[in-house]
Amino acid sequence: MATLTPRQQQIYDLIRQTIQRTGFPPTRAEIAAEFGFSSPNAAEEHLRALARKGVIELTPGASRGIRLRAAGDTAQHQFSLPSMGLMQLTLPLVGRVAAGSPILAAEHIDRQYQVDPSLFSAQPDFLLKVRGMSMRDAGILDGDLLAVQRASEATNGKIVVARLGDDVTVKRFQRKGRHVELIAENPDFEPIHVDLDRDEFHLEGLAVGLIRPAAP
């Protein structure tokens, strides 16, 4: 790893620990709050310095678009498929989901991935290929593989995989009484409002981490 200043090391450690705890990197605002910076712009300057030193990669326009890079730029890092020596957990990769059938039905499984379970905040049950950019500001991009733990309930603020009628979506969960709001992390997308007494809704699981396949 490149030589970091004490403050850069603290920020790098915060990113790594947040990913290990939650499965996702912190936002600029969260970094600023943690270190008492006057604004997220100050955090951005430190992140750019870390990127110049080659220890992280930044995704423009995404508030959680921070990716750790391994020493030597091997691309075997927090968000990439791990090396053969670390492969311990076999997870099915779910592609497109047909209407009316279980998400883990055999016809939905594109392939099996072997991954290191320590990459995730909790043990996942499957991977879901992300389609679209509605969760861009959470650092979840089109083509990413979202690690999902099966669950039928979620607490407010969690990122979930939900089925709405014939559609499967990844959104942030917010519930009040019999009403659920599924919130995108991209201002171009409106929230989805669900009436549990009227709409066909099923929670498939909770996001517990992310794999970003290395570019070819």
UniProtKB/Swiss-Prot annotation:
UniProt xrefs under SUPFAM superfamilies: LexA/Signal peptidase, Winged helix' DNA-binding domain
Keyword rRNA-binding: no
Listed GO biological process terms: DNA repair; DNA replication; negative regulation of DNA-templated transcription; proteolysis; SOS response
Class of the enzyme per the UniProt entry, highest EC level: hydrolase
MF annotations from Gene Ontology: DNA binding; serine-type endopeptidase activity
UniProt function note: Represses a number of genes involved in the response to DNA damage (SOS response), including recA and lexA. In the presence of single-stranded DNA, RecA interacts with LexA causing an autocatalytic cleavage which disrupts the DNA-binding part of LexA, leading to derepression of the SOS regulon and eventually DNA repair.
Family from the record: Belongs to the peptidase S24 family.
Listed name of the protein: LexA repressor
